[in-house]
Amino acid sequence: MDRNLFVDKEDDDDRIIRVTGGTEVQGTASAIASVFYEQNYVKVQAAGAQAVNQAVKAIAVARSYIAVRGMDLIVRPGFINIEGRDNQTISAIVFRLSLT
């Protein structure tokens, strides 16, 4: 398992995949597809240019995994503020993926 990949549960029905700049694309794509198969919905969060780059590539690869089952994704990007170190607020991008 990629040590830079975090899958967290926000509540009973919602999972968020947190991507860093060092996250492996293939592993992230597999995690996205796995969560998507379970609940037809997943959030991918990335903060920083490298993390966003890795997240976008992983979403593209996950889309090809999901397409094999005759499904396609809608990707809705948005921004959130998260608390970083020393109480600094960091802006992150959240990609919300759902069925078309």
Question: Residues of each region from the PLM?
Answer:
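Conserved mixed alpha/beta catalytic, RNA-binding, or beta-rich assembly cores of soluble enzyme
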Residues: 13-41, 55-59, 63
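C-terminal edge-of-domain segments
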Residues: 70-100
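Long, polar low-complexity intrinsically disordered regions
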Residues: 1-9
